[in-house]
Amino acid sequence: LICVKEKFLFSETTETCPDGQNVCFNQAHLIYPGKYKRTRGCAATCPKLQNRDVIFCCSTDKCNL
């Protein structure tokens, strides 16, 4: 499985997930209205929601754009 680690305007950085991590995630944490900090990568399971977070999980290559 290949997940996006960072996304830029015209490019992206990817990572190959190790054995046992078969989920890609895209987590957006609200810093203040209109401003989010995004975290992307591989995980064994979908991360738990925390206060003011939005999380998207998927299991195909580069699905966490």
From Swiss-Prot:
Disulfide bridges in this chain: 3-24, 17-42, 46-57, 58-63
Any Pfam family the entry gives: Toxin_cobra-type
UniProt keyword annotations, A-Z: Disulfide bond, G-protein coupled acetylcholine receptor impairing toxin, G-protein coupled receptor impairing toxin, Neurotoxin, Postsynaptic neurotoxin, Secreted, Toxin
CDD domains, A to Z: TFP_snake_toxin
One GO MF term: toxin activity
Keyword Nucleotide-binding: no
Expression (tissue specificity): Expressed by the venom gland.
InterPro entries, sorted: Snake_3FTx, Snake_toxin-like_sf, Snake_toxin_con_site, Toxin_cobra-type
Self-association state and partner proteins as the record states: Monomer.
Biological function: Binds weakly to the muscarinic acetylcholine receptor (CHRM). Does not show inhibition on GABA(A) receptors.
Similarity section: Belongs to the three-finger toxin family. Short-chain subfamily. Type C muscarinic toxin sub-subfamily.
Protein name: Muscarinic toxin-like protein Tx-NM3-2
